[in-house]
Amino acid sequence: MASPRHILLINGPNLNLLGTREPQIYGSTTLHDIEQAAQTQASSLGLRLSTFQSNHEGAIIDRIHQAAGFSPSLSPSGAAAATTTEAGAGPGTGVDKLSAIIINPGAYTHTSVGIRDALLGTGIPFVEVHVSNVHAREAFRHHSYLSDKAAAVICGLGPFGYSAALEFAGRHMKL
């Protein structure tokens, strides 16, 4: 039996504060709740899902590289710079080839050429997700460095956006 397709869900800066940070914009659902619902949905779709959250751009880039089978960079102390919640894989374990990435880059959406280049450099298809409607917010949030290269962009659906992204990745992307 073939192993299930593997999808990585990446959440960027401040998304660990979901549920308490500006609930009038982001709602009351926590990142843990979103990840648990995504795990349940992935299982029902026959997918393997790994989750990762970091407030640090370099750690996100390292995790994207790792997703394509490249070893993560090491900090000056020699420790791996990125962490992951999946069992049996993680920094320093070598190849971790994925079928797709679902990414909510948070504020890095509007600033990170590095994350864009990492996604493009790995060639792994990705879906960009935002809890809020970034186009209905401040002008500086209207530009995304990722959207023009994403297989799909989902914004303004609240936590359901993650479910829609997972459904799209699992059923409609050529993985």
Curated annotation (Swiss-Prot):
Q: What is its EC number?
A: 4.2.1.10
State the Gene Ontology terms under molecular function. Answer: 3-dehydroquinate dehydratase activity
Q: Where is the signal peptide?
A: none
InterPro entries from the UniProt entry: DHquinase_II (IPR001874), DHquinase_II_CS (IPR018509), DHquinase_II_sf (IPR036441)
Give the residues the record marks as binding substrate.
Answer: 104, 110, 117, 131-132, 141
User: Hey, where's the site called Transition state stabilizer on this chain?
Assistant: 21
Query: Which CDD domains does the protein's record reference?
Result: DHQase_II
Which UniProt keywords are given for this protein, alphabetically ordered? Lyase, Quinate metabolism
Family affiliation: Belongs to the type-II 3-dehydroquinase family.
Instruction: Quote the catalytic residue positions.
Output: 26, 130
Reaction equations catalysed: 3-dehydroquinate = 3-dehydroshikimate + H2O
Query: Its quaternary structure?
Result: Homododecamer. Adopts a ring-like structure, composed of an arrangement of two hexameric rings stacked on top of one another.
> Would you tell me the protein name for this molecule?
Catabolic 3-dehydroquinase
Q: Which Gene3D superfamilies is this protein grouped with?
A: Dehydroquinase, class II
UniProt pathway annotation: Aromatic compound metabolism; 3,4-dihydroxybenzoate biosynthesis; 3,4-dihydroxybenzoate from 3-dehydroquinate: step 1/2
GO biological process, alphabetically ordered? 3,4-dihydroxybenzoate biosynthetic process; quinate catabolic process
Would you say which domain of life the source belongs to?
Eukaryota
Q: What PROSITE patterns does UniProt report for this protein, alphabetically?
A: DEHYDROQUINASE_II
Keyword Lyase (UniProt): yes
Function of the molecule: Is involved in the catabolism of quinate. Allows the utilization of quinate as carbon source via the beta-ketoadipate pathway.
Q: What class of enzyme is it?
A: lyase
Asked if the record carries the keyword DNA repair, the reply is no
